[in-house]
Curated annotation (Swiss-Prot):
The gene is BOLA3. Keywords: Disease variant, Mitochondrion, Primary mitochondrial disease. Widely expressed. It is found in: Mitochondrion. This is BolA-like protein 3. The lineage of its organism: Eukaryota, Metazoa, Chordata, Craniata, Vertebrata.
């Protein structure tokens, strides 16, 4: 059996886009996450929390969005999700899937 070496392990430590996985683990946000976050901040200016996570390994195919905003007050969950979908209408065309979690800030 051959001894372990960093060079031999390098192919195993590469993510979907060829970036080392440890870069993704310690990076703050991907370009796609930043873009989606910025759009949501513009569309929901009263949001108290927005978290966008690329759950497709960094390739931008699937995102999880958690957003807390007063704009959702007195709206059913399906209406809240429709608002998020409408805000991201153009970006969704390039995605495989989207998980949305919405809430109203607690007082």
């Amino acid at each position: 059996m051959a001894a372990w070496s960093p060079a031999a392990a390098a192919p195993l430590l590469r993510g979907i886009r060829g970036l080392p996985l440890h870069h993704r683990m310690f990076a703050t946000q991907t370009e796609g996450e930043l873009r989606v976050t910025q759009i949501l901040k513009e569309k929901f200016p009263r949001a108290t929390a927005i978290k966008v996570t690329d759950i497709s390994g960094g390739c931008g195919a699937m995102y999880e969005i958690k957003i807390e905003s007063e704009e959702f007050k007195e709206k059913r969950t399906v209406q809240q999700h429709q608002m998020v979908n409408q805000a991201l209408k153009e970006e969704i065309k390039e995605m495989h899937g989207l998980r949305i979690f919405t809430s109203v800030p607690k007082r």
